[in-house]
Amino acid sequence: TGILLAFVCPPTTPVWMLIIGGFFSIVVVKQLYGGIGCNFVNPALVGRAMLLASYASAMTHWVGFGSKLPLVGSTADVVTSSTPMAVMKGIFSAETAEDALAAVNDLTSTFSISDMFIGRIGGSLGETSALALLLGFVYLLLRRVINWQIPVCYIGTVAVLTLISAPAGMSAVDFMLYNVFGGGLMLGAIFMATDYVTSPFTTKGKLFYGVFIGLITFLIRHFGSMNEGMSYAILLGNLMTPWFNAWGHQTPLGYKKPQKAAKGGKE
């Protein structure tokens, strides 16, 4: 939980703030509900949501790639930078076609797809390098720690929706790659949405769950006021997990539904 919380926070987040977030995630969200295996939502994402609501400025403060971070307690200046999702938000909030085209040019000139794939961009600790996240995905699959259904359905849903909603002046494939590689989508899909405790355990339930959180992420990114929707999409999916398990329940082969007894006690 502590590592995942650090992964979804900016590298300039103060240590004392991380301690507060870790306490809230582990003690309030996990231990008060019975400890390991008893929490019904992802503790790290709830901790991030709490920090974002309480310290919005610090949680949205980014540094550019290659910036020299100050040591603990230092007041050295850090060069601030935007993230791909923050720049992309200008495309959806544009009121005119000219503004949208200007936002597209700003996105493509500021960030390249190759930089986003390798990790030469600003962002939270665990979301900047799509390559590293893909390697982690392959490793977890080979070790049978996670299954493919949730990550593939989650990322695939966002990919399909962004392919069909690309703005004018930008290739649909490029727009899709910016959305897949940008933000915390891959981090959430691989390391957070697959949490055993808070995700469905039925095969069909995992498929429903992945599509659902992919849809919510797309809607928040494109129509909401926030730049990123991964955290809230997964938390909503966590709350829906019992229903996904029920919808994905498979009836055993040969099962016969018991017949009700006739009225009057006669069978």
Residue ranges with predicted function:
Residues 26-37, 133-144, 190-199:
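C-terminal ends of transmembrane helices
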Residues 37-133:
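Long hydrophobic alpha-helical segments that form multi-pass transmembrane helix bundles
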